[in-house]
Amino acid sequence: MTPKLILASSSPFRRMLMENAGLFFEAHPAEIDERAVEAPLEKAGAKPDTVACVLAKAKAEDVSARFPESLVIGSDQTMSLGDRVFHKPKDIADAANHLRALSGTTHRLNSAIVLVRDGAVLWEHVGHAELTMRPLTEDFIARHLSRVGERALSSVGAYQLEGEGVQLFEKIEGDYFTILGLPMLPLLGKLRELGTIDG
């Protein structure tokens, strides 16, 4: 039987958010080269929220091709500081560089969701959050990264707000779910509107 609702992601955090909301779904990660999709957009000067939306759409369309009758949720998150777009750090040294760049500044998270069925886009949404990181010393960055280890490599910005990363911040504006990479309230509203979940 074809699943009714599919999350096109391997992210344990996105799966957890959907499970905690009581949604019945399957998770099937997209098989796309994200950097190959993203590179021409960045070269053309696309805004970070546009990049997030295009990546979310590419993921959903890829999975929809395998499960055409299912409603597929594609999602992606980009992070920017001024004109600089951040990606997941490659290693701990790169994570330290991210934290140095973000220290004492306000950056933006852009979390996109796209719903696709039978290859057709039914809905797109991009949520935004502004996060102000407190000034961090070199010693603190080193101690923090020694505690969190490779978990720092699993998200843009080298932090996880749902864990010890919350200690890095002095101010946050925006929806918590958007920060975690899946704006749940707009998503749940659209799923109710489509009759996918009980409303």
Swiss-Prot record:
Broadest EC class assigned to this enzyme: hydrolase
GO biological process, one term: nucleotide metabolic process
Site feature location: Important for substrate specificity: F13, Q77, E162
Annotated EC: 3.6.1.-
Main subcellular location of this protein, as a coarse class: cytoplasm
Pfam families: Maf (PF02545)
Coiled-coil regions, chain positions: none
Cofactors that this protein relies on: a divalent metal cation
UniProt entry tagged with the keyword Hydrolase: yes
Compartment list: Cytoplasm
Keywords associated with the record: Cytoplasm, Hydrolase, Nucleotide metabolism
GO CC, alphabetical: cytoplasm
Keyword Lipid biosynthesis on entry: no
Catalytic residues as annotated in Swiss-Prot or TrEMBL: D76
GO molecular function, one term: nucleoside triphosphate diphosphatase activity
Reactions this protein catalyses: N(7)-methyl-GTP + H2O = N(7)-methyl-GMP + diphosphate + H(+)
SUPFAM superfamilies xrefs: ITPase-like
UniProt superkingdom: Bacteria
Function: Nucleoside triphosphate pyrophosphatase that hydrolyzes 7-methyl-GTP (m(7)GTP). May have a dual role in cell division arrest and in preventing the incorporation of modified nucleotides into cellular nucleic acids.
Entries under PANTHER family matching the protein: BIFUNCTIONAL DTTP/UTP PYROPHOSPHATASE/METHYLTRANSFERASE PROTEIN-RELATED (PTHR43213), BIFUNCTIONAL DTTP_UTP PYROPHOSPHATASE_METHYLTRANSFERASE PROTEIN-RELATED (PTHR43213:SF5)
Family note: Belongs to the Maf family. YceF subfamily.
The protein's name: 7-methyl-GTP pyrophosphatase
Natural source organism: Rhizobium etli (strain ATCC 51251 / DSM 11541 / JCM 21823 / NBRC 15573 / CFN 42)
